[in-house]
């Protein structure tokens, strides 16, 4: 496959991993907040890294016996997080946009066109609300 991962479905639909999840990720200084609802169990190979690490006991991640979620490899980022990932985690959105713009500039041989900062006040408030609700600092 494209990524050095293996995903298998565990049992039946009753074996889904469902609920809120909080991650620490190199893409964001703030905890990454999301919701997971998946039956797949994903194991990462040695050539990829996780999107993030499950913080505390909030969430499952790639497996019910691990503490990581998602995958990162070069310009590819994957995660089981839903709900709504980018609007509750503006730092992740900014990192993905910056990476795409840098790649575009490199491919076109032009100067990197970084975007100016936006007011992330409401998005940061949504992140803070969920962290408080889930008991995560």
Locate each region found by the language model.
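Pocket-forming structural segment of enzyme catalytic cores
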Residues: 1-69
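Acyltransferase
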Residues: 72-137
């Amino acid at each position: 496959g494209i990524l050095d991962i293996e995903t298998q479905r565990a049992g039946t639909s009753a074996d889904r991993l469902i609920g809120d999840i909080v991650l620490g990720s190199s893409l964001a200084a703030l905890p990454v907040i999301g919701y997971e609802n998946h039956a797949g169990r994903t194991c990462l190979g040695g050539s990829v890294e996780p999107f993030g690490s499950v913080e505390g006991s909030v969430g499952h991640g790639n497996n019910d016996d691990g503490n990581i979620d998602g995958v990162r490899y070069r310009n590819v980022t994957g995660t089981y997080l839903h709900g709504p990932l980018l609007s509750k985690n503006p730092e992740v959105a900014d990192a993905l946009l910056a990476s795409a713009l840098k790649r575009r500039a490199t491919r076109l041989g032009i100067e990197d066109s970084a975007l100016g900062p936006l007011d992330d006040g409401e998005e940061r408030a949504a992140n803070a609300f969920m962290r408080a609700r889930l008991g995560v600092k």
